[in-house]
Amino acid sequence: DSVVRNDQAFSLFSSFTLGYYREAMIVLWALLVENKHFSSAVVNSPMFSVLFADILFFVFQGKQNGTLASVVHLCGVILLLLSESEDFACALNKKSPQTLPFDLTGVIPGTSTLTDVLILLMSSLFCEVTEYDPLLEMFLIVLSNSSSGLQGLSFTSASKLIALIGRLSRSKFLVQSPRNSFLLTVALDIIDNVLQSSLANNPSFVYVALENEKLFRRIAEMTPRSILDSAVAIPRPKDGYEPEPAPQLPPFATEQWYQKLLSSMCVKHIVDIIQALLKETQSICQGEAEDQDRLMDFLKSVEYPSEIPLVSHQMRKYEHGLQSAQWVVA
């Protein structure tokens, strides 16, 4: 009697309703945990794009309905487990189904890749990042785990991803919670992996990264003092009004903590790659209307700068435990 039902919980690509969709997803989660080879079978299935779209649909539904919080968490766990498969990135490079169970600005069904859909859904759910959210962390880790093999990212999804990094790098956000800096670190790992591994296969992504060189340079030039000063900046009082008391930083936001943050970010490596590519493009850009077309043609065949060493990033895996199991089935 306590089984959760939802009349909208069905696959739009078949006539079979999934009245017990939560139970079906728990079975999938259990199989992925118990059988490490099962994830490869799932991501290599010809129906993977349909399954992936349905999982994102449940996330989309759950974020709008507080009673489905456990379903949202379950979807995140399933995606994390799937992202540990070596073939997951290749699966994300596939085109999305011709019909999607939700509408997202920037997504073209049948043309956008599954990675584009994932990034644009993440962007729509977290268009204003004001506090730490475990779902955002799951999305970022899923992308980070697969980022070295991603190809064909669209201009729109690349722009949204880098815009998210801009929001995650705000000083006030970083000092809000000790976990927030981890979100920025993982997001930067995504950018670095794509730039290192798939330059020629992601011309739109590289183009957007070059356009945002100032953002990455600003993050790279952050110092403990500048972050702290920016986070507690006091606006000038208006005439006739007393200045507001200076906000207090949380206890964790020490200079030592920020030194650890700055050392964990790969942003300086990103800046080195971008600046090397910008030097190569100087002869292409001549201040003419055709510059963008010439630049895109160049980026389709660009090679990684040989003078910049490669940097490896860790695979972040899901850790199964009693607390997670209780949360999922709650």
What spans do the regions from the language model cover?
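Eukaryotic scaffolding regions of large macromolecular assemblies
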Residues: A53-L56, K63-A330
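Alpha-solenoid helical-repeat scaffolds
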Residues: D1-S70
